[in-house]
């Protein structure tokens, strides 16, 4: 792994941890009630952080290893982009016409062995079609920006690594 690629992955790890902490702070400090899609995006942020940590621990030595790392980090980020884009579409629909965004994560994972430990991360029953704003910008737009920055950064760093 070249120094540039390694620094980029460290940066993505730090930004991902901050984004995850920010999503928890928005819920538990600011009192925002996350919806199912918000929690899905939160899980994609967490998965991105975990993928960057794994790539940092594996320390790929060849360009092909860096390629694997870039793909590995990009998968949860691209998934997050698609979830956030779907939520933006839901929020663009006229009031009352948006479909349900699914069963709450707490319902889906109730029988899971680690549910008691993981429950604060997936708790939330907000309405997916009702936008919440941060600095005047809808939260799914922030999510798309974050995930897009992850994808662009990791592929830029991989392309520059020689």
Curated annotation (Swiss-Prot):
Residues 26-43, 86-141 are periplasmic. Coiled coil: none annotated. GO terms for biological process: protein folding. It is a multi-pass membrane protein. GO terms for molecular function: electron transfer activity; protein-disulfide reductase activity. GO terms for cellular component: plasma membrane. The chain crosses the membrane at residues 9-25, 44-60, 68-85, 142-160. This is Disulfide bond formation protein B. It comes from Neisseria meningitidis serogroup B (strain ATCC BAA-335 / MC58). It is found in: Cell inner membrane. InterPro entries: DiS_bond_form_DsbB/BdbC, Disulphide_bond_form_DsbB, DsbB, DsbB-like_sf. Signal peptide: none annotated. Keywords: Cell inner membrane, Cell membrane, Chaperone, Disulfide bond, Electron transport, Membrane, Oxidoreductase, Redox-active center, Transmembrane, Transmembrane helix, Transport.
């Amino acid at each position: 792994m070249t120094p540039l690629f390694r620094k980029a992955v460290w940066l993505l790890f730090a930004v991902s941890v901050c984004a995850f902490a920010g999503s928890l702070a928005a819920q538990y400090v600011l009192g925002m009630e996350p919806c199912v899609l918000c929690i899905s995006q939160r899980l994609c942020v967490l998965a991105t952080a975990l993928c960057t940590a794994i790539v940092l621990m594996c320390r790929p030595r060849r360009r092909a290893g860096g390629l694997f790392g870039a793909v590995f980090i990009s998968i949860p980020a691209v998934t997050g982009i698609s979830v956030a884009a779907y939520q933006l579409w839901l929020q663009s629909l006229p009031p009352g016409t948006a479909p349900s965004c699914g069963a709450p994560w707490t319902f889906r994972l109730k029988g899971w062995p680690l549910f008691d430990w993981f429950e604060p991360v997936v708790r939330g029953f907000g309405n997916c079609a009702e936008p919440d704003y941060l600095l005047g910008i809808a939260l799914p737009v922030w999510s798309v920006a974050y995930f897009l920055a992850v994808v662009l950064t990791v592929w830029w760093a991989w392309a520059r690594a020689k």
